[in-house]
Amino acid sequence: MILANTVWEAWDKTLETKDFTHLEKYLSADFQVEDTTGEVDNLENTKSWCVAGGLRINNFKTIRETKNYIVATHDVIQEGKPNSSVLVYAEQTNGKFTYWKIQRAFEA
């Protein structure tokens, strides 16, 4: 089981350094991330936006954590966009995250 704080730290370190190896070890080869609009990206597309820069996450709060999923919130700071908050639901199987769903709300 990957703890929520472990994956948050890896994701933030990836965004900070633009080095996907920090996060990649926690994601399955068939990893999918679904955004607020319902658009689904694969592992390669996730890597692309993670290493592009201009995005940071912070203020992590775990709501629920089990061996199969986590539910949490965090804030996002992204160049050219208002600050936002994200609700995350993420599933893991066999020690890797396979699915990540976000609901993102921007400040007015």
Segments predicted by a language model, with ranges:
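Short, low-complexity N-terminal intrinsically disordered segments enriched in polar/charged residues
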Residues: 1-25, 29
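A structural signal for short, well-ordered beta-strand elements
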Residues: 16, 39-40
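A beta-strand edge to alpha-helix "cap/lid" segment located at domain peripheries
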Residues: 9, 34, 40-108
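Generic secondary-structure microfeatures
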Residues: 27-30, 35-37
